[in-house]
Structure formats: C-alpha cells, structure tokens
Amino acid sequence: MVETSTSLVKLEQDGSLFLPPGFRFHPTDAEVILSYLLQKFLNPSFTSLPIGEVDLNKCEPWDLPSKAKMGEKEWYFFSHKDMKYPTGMRTNRATKEGYWKATGKDREIFNLQPTSYGGSSNNKNNKQLVGMKKTLVFYMGRAPKGTKTNWVMHEFRLHANLHNDNPNLRLNLKDEWVVCKVFHKKGDDREAINKQQAQAAAVDQYSAGTPNNGSSVEAGDDDDDLFQLDSIIDPSIYFSNSSAANILSAPPNMSNSVVAANYGASTTTTGTASAGSFQQQPNYCSLINKSISSSNVSSWNNMPPPPPVAEGGVHGIGSSYSLQHQAAMVKALRDVIRLPNPLGMPQYKLDDAYLWDSS
C-alpha cells in the first residue's frame, strides 16, 4: 500500500524537497525532456520541486549543490541559455573562475512509443526524436589554456520534432531553456586548482618583475649617453670614404686586423696577459687624421667653436681637424671599437672646453 503524499514527500521550509531514505530523483533522459523541459517551454512560469533554476554563468560548479532543491551526487537545474554575442549564435559558457567546454558529439534522445500490449519497443518506427544531450566539462582559467576538472554537465535541449505534437511550442535558439544535470566524477580537483593558482602567481610575478621597456635609457643614468652605439650610429656620417666606414662594422678585437694601405693607417700591437697572444689593431689616430674631413663630422654636444689652430698643428698633429673634435670622436667611438683610449689622446676636461690633460 502506497503512503499518502503528505507522509511520503515533505517540503522543507527553505523550499527544498525531502524524500525518505531510498528515494532518488533519477529520471531518464526522455523524462527530463518531456516531463520537465517541455513544460517549461509551454509555460515559462512552470516550476518543479526537484529542479531548481540558476544562471550558470554566475555560478561556479562547486557552488551549485547548495543551490539545488535536492540531490546528493547529481543536481538538476533549469537554465536560460546566454548568447556570447547579441547577433551571434554561440553560447556563452564562461564563469568568473573558468568555463564549460563541450566534449564529444551531441547524443539524440528518443521517446519510446508504447505498444498495443502496454510495453515499449525499440523498433525504429516506434521511437520519436524528442531532444539532444550535450556533455560539457568545466575548466579552470581561460580558454584555451584552462585546466580540466572533474565537474561534468549534461545539457538537455528540445528537438524541433516536438513542434509537430505541440502547435503552441515556439523554439527560439536565442531565447531557449535547457535542463542541466551537474555532477562530480570521482577524483580530486586540487591538482587543477593548484596548477591554476601557480599559473596566476607566475603571471603576477612576471608582471611585477618586467622592466619598463618604453625607453632604452632610464632617467638619471649618466653613463648611458652613448648606449648601443654599434646599432644606432651610421659610420658613413662621419667618414667621407665608405671603405673607411666599414672598419667600424668589423668585429672588435679581431686578431691581425688589417687596414688597407690606401688609408695610410699603421697598426699598433696590443697583447692580452691572460691569453698570451698578440693582436694587431689599426692606429685610429692616423686613420682619423687622414680619412676624416671636418665637413663630414657632426658637432657633438653642441660644443663651442674651437680656437684657431696655429700653423703646423697642435701637439705635433698636423691637421686642420681640431683636437677638441677628435677627442669627442674618440670618446664616442671608444665603446664601438672597445679599446681603452686607443689613440693615446689627451683627456678632455669638462670644466674648461679648451684645456687638456697632458699627463
């Protein structure tokens, strides 16, 4: 004898449904479509005791069990599909912490028609296609680099064939109700959560430690006036002869560097104590005096014009090209050729533009 509904089924004060031990809400796929989802389409105000209503885009999967009306391992919800774009047909499946990703093919749901003897038949002619079921898995993070979890959802939707038996049914893909069954497979999501937290921490650390690359020179760097000269100086600006300009393009400290005879540049021998070998380097002082004309040199640092040079030159260097400009050129090219004062030129004093340190 079946107990009365008042003693068998109780409605809790919070609206959840209470069933005695042993009773479960475990409908078939066809029952979900015909007994619940179809009724929601025919009457949007339809509610069901075992199926709640949520916005899946505003809830994380681990929060859904507390929002369900009933269920211990499986939870059912009505949900209104949210479109990703107002004019598109793609469904928005993202939440704050992750997203639902479809997996596999959609499965057809058939309703088995009753036979004359009261049972049901698997005969193809006795089956009616009533809905579709899509399987989705929740991923932590953002696509396409999300971390897979053990939260799974089955999404049930109506099939257009039901319109034949229900003339009042109106299907609109942009305004569609679905029933979602959410459950958690056996397993631990701590690995996925830890991986997601590690990725977030790595992004934060990278963002905090990345220097501002908007400028190659930081404010206040007094020694960076000539930064990366080998990449920003065009030697052809300062040499009237293109072949002479190519000298600056040669790798620094090359062994036995040879200067063409037509430049009249001699070579100086330098040695390295660690390697115990000697290298031939061009005498850039001779090269500058014989290959550079003052008309091809830019005025560096807007220096004042030099005083007249006496006939015969200054400091024994016979050239109309002033020592002041030569010293500025040497300083500029020192990082390029990577030689410490290779010309043996007197040091330029900053306090007086025309005084030289001859020591």
Swiss-Prot record:
Q: Which GO terms describe its biological process?
A: positive regulation of DNA-templated transcription; response to salt stress; response to water deprivation
According to its UniProt record, where is this protein located? Nucleus
Q: Which UniProt keywords apply?
A: Activator, DNA-binding, Nucleus, Stress response, Transcription, Transcription regulation
* Gene induction: Induced by salt and cold stresses. Induced by drought stress.
Domain NAC, residue spans: 19-185
- Has keyword Ligase? no
Q: Which InterPro entries match?
A: NAC-dom (IPR003441), NAC_dom_sf (IPR036093)
Q: Name the source's superkingdom.
A: Eukaryota
What GO molecular-function term can you cite, just one?
DNA binding
Q: Which Gene3D superfamilies match?
A: NAC domain (2.170.150.80)
Q: What is its main location?
A: nucleus
Q: Does the keyword Cell division apply?
A: no
GO cellular component term of the entry, any? nucleus
User: How does the entry describe the domains?
Assistant: The NAC domain includes a DNA binding domain and a dimerization domain.
**What is the protein's given name?**
NAC domain-containing protein 45
The organism's lineage is:
Eukaryota, Viridiplantae, Streptophyta, Embryophyta, Tracheophyta
